[in-house]
Design a protein with these regions (language model features):
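Clamp-loader machinery-focused feature within the broader ASCE/P-loop NTPase space
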Residues: 2-169
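Charged, glycine-rich active-site and insertion segments that engage polyanionic ligands
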Residues: 2-49, 55-57, 65-69, 183-186, ...
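Conserved adenine-binding aromatic site and its adjacent loop/helix in ATP-hydrolyzing domains
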Residues: 144, 176, 203
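Secondary-structure boundary motif
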Residues: 148-151, 180, 224
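Conserved Walker B catalytic segment
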Residues: 156-184, 193
Length: 381
């Protein structure tokens, strides 16, 4: 995968190429950002540029043997670790990434490196609640693989996707090698939630923060995917919030029904909160708990967006709000109840609930606490 294959991120791509050209390659790097920002794809493109024999114009050639092998995730000096699991796993059964490498390569090729953790778990057929993880035995395998000499490239590279899914034992096992790796060994950690990593791991890495994709880049991408109306393309780029995966859902119409469901949940929550309907709020929480974990987190993201848009309406800066239709109608009426005194606590409560859901917290308990907390905050103006 070449830098040219990455959507947007021109400044970061240029910076990464310059560090390689100048010989400033840190042995342990932590790429952080959502999947839709291109974090995994960018990490692979970086490794490909590092190993390419015929770099030109700030990019890999894409044609030499190293480039072709890395693009296929099949280079002998590129080792991959990612969260895995399976239905019906027996007690004590050891599951490693290598067993699922063909599926991972296929998904990476199909989606050009842009796919979410949930899409990977769906490919593994893990169901609604089962998630992948990186176990302690996987850490042993990391150390074993990196103890060998490189086959072809100058560097041996260990790329760990979603290191936050490591259990504590696995994380502790790789600390030593992160701090004092073998010569010409490169660690690339690709994380969506670096705050869930051990601080001792984060402190041993150089962070590469992958930002949201610029709205104008997503707008052009919407046009390229067949959106003809400039206003619709602009609104989609705004709603995607820097995330190429979300833009794809919007263009395909896949987000419409889900966004409507999230909007209805949001309206119900705010109306019940304003009227202090505590028993009904408990029922609301039970309904929200029936969604899949990915849908629950999606609802919380939409709730944060609607609260921010309502706050902008409250502050009188309608010109930078991209609401329309029933969302605009509701938020215009709701805006007086979202001000400077409660917007930050409300967003903090959403972020806390989202983190608890991501960590497999009981959704009924999480949403009950969330709903009752929101009820207290709505009137605090």
């Amino acid at each position: 995968m070449r830098f040219a294959d990455i959507t947007g991120q021109d400044d970061l791509k240029r910076h990464l190429a310059q560090t390689v050209d100048a010989g400033r390659v840190s042995h342990a790097q932590l790429f952080t950002g959502a999947s839709g920002f291109g974090t995994l794809a960018l990490a692979v493109a970086y490794v490909q540029y590092l190993c390419c024999r015929y770099r030109r114009n700030g990019d890999s050639c894409g044609e030499c043997p190293d480039c072709r092998q890395i693009e296929a995730l099949a280079h002998p000096d590129l080792h991959l670790v990612f969260p895995v699991n399976k239905q019906g796993k027996k007690s004590g059964e050891v599951i490693r990434s290598d067993e699922f490498l063909p599926q991972f390569r296929t998904l990476f090729a199909e989606r050009r490196g842009y796919f979410s953790p949930q899409e990977w778990y769906d490919r593994l057929d893990l169901g609604k609640t089962l998630k992948g993880m990186i176990a302690a035995r996987e850490a042993d395998e990391i150390i074993r693989k990196l103890s060998f000499k490189s086959f072809e490239a100058d560097y041996k590279t260990m790329l760990v996707w979603l290191p936050e899914t490591m259990n504590e034992e696995a994380a502790n096992k790789i600390l030593k090698i992160l701090e004092e790796p073998w010569e010409r060994t490169l660690f690339i950690l690709v994380s969506e939630h670096p705050d869930r990593l051990l601080p001792t791991i984060v402190s041993r890495t150089q962070e590469v923060c992958v930002p949201r994709i610029a709205p104008e880049v997503l707008e052009r991408e919407a046009f390229a995917r067949g959106v003809a109306d400039p206003l619709q393309a602009r609104n989609m780029a705004r709603l995607a919030d820097g995330d190429l995966l979300e833009l794809g859902h919007l263009v395909a119409g896949e987000s419409d029904a889900q966004r409507k469901e999230h909007f209805d949940l949001f309206c119900s929550l705010m109306r019940l909160s304003y009227n202090d309907k505590h028993l009904e709020l408990v029922t609301w929480a039970e309904d929200a708990a029936q969604l899949s974990r990915e849908q629950q987190r999606g609802f919380l993201r939409d709730a944060a967006r609607l609260l921010r848009e309502s706050y902008m309406l409250h502050a009188g800066i309608r010109e930078i709000s991209y609401l329309w239709g029933e969302e605009l109608a509701f938020c215009t009426k709701f805006a007086p109840f979202v001000g400077s005194q409660n917007i930050e606590p409300l967003i903090a409560e959403i972020e806390s609930a989202s983190a608890q859901i991501a960590q497999n917290g009981n959704p009924t308990i999480v949403f009950t606490h969330f709903a009752l907390s929101v009820s207290k905050m709505i009137k605090h103006l």
